[in-house]
C-alpha cells in the first residue's frame, strides 16, 4: 500500500466515524444504517444489544433515540490500523442526555471497530461499545426546544 493510499484510507475512516455521530445527532437513520456493511454488527453489551445488518441497526437506533428527551455525543480520534481492504481501530466517546422518563446519563466509552472497504467506501463491519465510566446524576441543564433552535 502506498503512503498516499494509507493517508487517504485514514482520512476516509476518520470521516466515517464523524458521519456516525453526525447521522445520530441529526436523526438521519437511513444514513446511520448505511455506514455499516450489509452484514455489519453493532454491539452495546452494557444494555445487552447486538444488531446484525442495516435493517436491524436502523430500527434499533431510531427506537433507542426515541427514549431520549435530548442526547449529545462527541467522538475523539483514536487509533486506526490498516490491513489492505480491512482495518481495525478505536474511537473515544463522551455522551450525555436525559431520558424521557426524567433519568439522566453521562458516560465515557470506547468504540472498538472493524472497518471494511466496500465499493461505496469504508464502512463499519463491526462497532462494539465499551462503557468505561457512567454517571446517572440528574443533569441540571436542558436542550432548547426545536422552535427556539429554528430562530
For the regions a protein language model found, what residue spans apply to each?
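Short, low-complexity N-terminal intrinsically disordered segments enriched in polar/charged residues
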Residues: 1-34, 38
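Charge-dense, low-complexity intrinsically disordered segments
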Residues: 3, 7, 48-51, 102
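Hydrophobic (often cysteine-bearing) scaffold residues that line and stabilize catalytic clefts
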Residues: 9, 13, 53, 107
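A solvent-exposed, acidic/Ser-Thr-rich amphipathic alpha-helical stretch
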Residues: 29-93
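A beta-strand edge to alpha-helix "cap/lid" segment located at domain peripheries
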Residues: 64-151
